[in-house]
Amino acid sequence: MKTVLQKDIVETFKKLNDTLSSFSEEEINTVPFQGSWTPGQVVQHIILGNSGYPELFEGKTKATIRKYDEHVKELESIFLNFNTKMDAPDFLKPEMKNYNKNSLTLALLKIESDLLKASENYDLTLTCLDFQVPGFENFTIYEWINFALVHSQRHTHQLQKISHYITTL
């Protein structure tokens, strides 16, 4: 379980970092079309949504009385359905400002490192009690890491579409 999860973490963040590196410093802060976030804002949203996991995993947990990965397929079906538009909750909406590509890259590397360490050092079957995604019961550590992955994959896809749009302007 841990080896496969760690491979998924590395692959997800490699694709995300490769996509981010394809943007110039100027393109990072370019609004591709009306109503869209800039690539920098998309990455900042990923950072906001995928930060704080070590603290969550260190918080209150309990033994899980269901399958530890019960919600993974549902999360995949929601987040990897690219035909569905979602609205971020206010606390995950990125500020409209100029973002620095290097700072974003460093923040993503820290998140990748945090997730890899968590996947190695924690009992992934424990249920976290300190935070809950609306509409779901409390997630296990395994499900939280998968949430971070499908969230990142969704927005990597969004960044690839923005890149295509910007380069064809």
Predicted regions and their residues:
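A short small-residue
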Residues: 26-27, 88-96, 132-135
